[in-house]
Amino acid sequence: MGLPPLEFSDCYLDSPQFRERLKSHEIELDKTNKFIKELIKDGKSLVAAHKNLSCAKRKFAGSLNEFKFRCIGDAETDDEICIARSLQEFAAVLGNLEDERIRMIDNSGEVLISPLEKFRKEQVGAAKEVKKKYDKESEKYCAMLEKHMNLSSKKKEVLLHEADVQLDQMRQHFYEVSLEYVLKVHEVQERKMFEFVEPLLAFLQGLFTFYHHGYELAKDFSDFKTQLSISIQNTRDRFEGTRSEVESLMKKMKENPHEHLALSPYTMEGYLYVQEKRHFGTSWVKHYCTYQRETKQMTMVPFDQKSGGKVGEEEIIHLKSCIRRKTESIEKRFCFDVEGVDRPTVLTMQALSEEDRKLWMEAMDGREPVYNSNKDSQSEGTAQLDNIGFSIIRKCIQAVETRGINEQGLYRIVGVNSRVQKLLNFLMDPKISPETETEIPSEWEIKTITSSLKTYLRMLPGPLMTYQFQRSFIKAAKLENQESRIKEIHCLIHRLPEKNRQMLNLLMTHLANVAAHHKQNLMTVANLGIVFGPTLLRPQEETVAAIMDIKFQNIVVEIIIENYEKMFSTVPEMPQTNSQLHLSRKRSSDSKPPSCSERPLTLFHTTHNTEKEEKRNSVNSSAESVSSSNANSSANSTCTQCSNMNNLNASDPDLDVAKASRPNSLSLNPSPTSPPTCPMFSAPSSPMPTSSTSSDSSPVSVPRKAKALYACKAEHDSELSFSAGTVFDNVYPSQEPGWLEGILNGKTGLIPENYVEFL
């Protein structure tokens, strides 16, 4: 496993888990620092000791062979694997040259020793200095916080206000130092991948020049040397892009940290001081607490952020009630009492501020929970995958291929933003009919046209390859076997919504044509992947982990461009159909719970957005036109339309494949609390509707009770968490494939279809 990413949002929570992750990075930096010192020492011995050259080589080679790179993330790219393997390759080369005793090269000190010493002092040393500053500020902040918490509420309001201001200033300063430290740690960990290996590569290249006996060995090494050089350059290029992204994210976090908090499974979490009664008096112990409103479960872990602080034993409380403490009833400020179901005594807790106490009270007193207040990462744009959208992309592609296919830096050189917006406004003008495929006037520069194409794709409400399948595409790129990557991506492409797949086909055919002219325009498949990866697979949440996955986004786009004919012209070998999978699940349901892969995917489209989408796309096909124009008609006509669509799909095998893997784009959107008027997806106890079923014979879904066969933990706010044996009320098929809707403890939510049986 690689090193875990350090999120900037965790600097504000400063949780025990964050401290543990930070400590693992610090240990890795210490190991790297010690290893570089040892490597420099060994290198000097190798240069100075001609008589002991063989012994020095063995030690040096042994040091290289023992060190293992640890990259950030749970998988490595081909370039990182190549770089990580390079030390073992170097050691093997030195082992083969062990018997050759020739004097050291004159410039080895400049080639090898100086860069490593420079990296150790300027990068690793700088990280240590920032660490000292971080530890010092952490100590000061915690000490001041404890002192502040002990202030009596009977003091004058002016003094209390002044103390609050001082604490807030200290806290902000601590957050800034913490952010800078995390940034520096990430930077050093990334830099060592090229600034550390590159001097070693240069040193070995110098050895080959002076060793006549190693000429043949050098020829054998040249292929790996070339591959490694490319990998180092690719890693360096990615580092430059990643660093700018991370710095930009850090600046956004600094300016408004509350808008960039990471999504959390907890309703509320943070530090609280808990009053503990002793034999002589009481004491206040700092705990990191988390609370889940659905289960009314509160978890407390004793922890102090001071250096060397140990994590205590976890304690779980099932909440019964939460009452605010009156100011006059206790000397401490910001206090409230918590009563547990399984605890005989009441716990008194102290929040860090009045605002913090209000948040805890709102989370625990039965009011509406305060979930993540982040703004949507992507506001609804005017761009859509409708006739206008396809027309705009086709016009841009036609202009590029007829006028600028050989321009150097195509798609990499950006146009002037004002010109780009002007061209997009012109192309998106509703007065211009989308059926009119007029060419873009020659007055528009190619870089303006290419920037407009990229901007339009970024303006879509979601990325072209969808948020739903983003993690699946990334996982496919992380597969070790290239054939497996291609096969998995091929399947995922055919699971995309039809319009997304059509647009992706149009774009990839064009990019393959651009790559075919790379000798003139210098835009290779790799360069196009760098340009379009973040656009086609943009993350739903802007985090450090998402930035680290950019390299895999690029790999996905490269694979699609290189294999675009196979990706879009052939249908992949799809897994079992929905009905077969349903039957197999029913057979195995008595023996074991469904695996994670059997858990259906949810789309989480809101009624509002779907209606807007259907309205905009109503001109695309006669079937969609029928659906949108009759959305408010009776249940009879609605079911007739559904039956007609089933008959239409039965005549087209391609549509059958699409239907088995994604929801029907024509499905209506009933309210969350009312059953659908058309049985698009049947309950487990009823047979799956076939394409030949007429509207008259289509049964209307009747809400029933269902019992959970297995426990399930919700992965989204719209899902329900439950244990085995739980009984649900008012259960009926959902518009989401593989899901049911039901009511549990007064809350309506989604339930996996293969996790329950009807009563």
Swiss-Prot record:
UniProt-listed CDD domains: BAR-PH_GRAF_family (cd01249), BAR_GRAF (cd07636), RhoGAP_Graf (cd04374), SH3_GRAF (cd12064)
Bias type Polar residues, positions: 638-650
Q: Which GO terms describe its cellular component?
A: cytoskeleton; cytosol; endosome membrane; focal adhesion
Q: Where is this site: Arginine finger?
A: 412
Q: Which GO terms describe its biological process?
A: signal transduction
Chain ranges of the PH domain: 265-369
Query: Where does the record place it?
Result: Cell junction, Focal adhesion; Cytoplasm, Cytoskeleton; Endosome membrane
Recite the UniProt keywords alphabetically: Cell junction, Cytoplasm, Cytoskeleton, Endosome, GTPase activation, Membrane, SH3 domain
Pfam families hit by this protein: BAR_3 (PF16746), PH (PF00169), RhoGAP (PF00620), SH3_9 (PF14604)
Q: Where is the composition biased (Basic and acidic residues)?
A: 608-617
Domain annotation BAR: ranges:
7-262
Q: Which residues form the Rho-GAP domain?
A: 383-568
Q: Which SMART domains match?
A: PH, RhoGAP, SH3
InterPro entries from the entry?
AH/BAR_dom_sf, BAR_dom, GRAF_BAR, GRAF_fam, GRAF_SH3, PH-like_dom_sf, PH_domain, PH_GRAF
Start and end residues of each SH3 domain: 701-759
This molecule's function is given as: GTPase-activating protein for rhoa and cdc42.
Q: What PANTHER family does the annotation carry?
A: OLIGOPHRENIN 1, RHO GTPASE-ACTIVATING PROTEIN 26
Protein name as it appears in the record = Rho GTPase-activating protein 26
State the encoding gene.
arhgap26
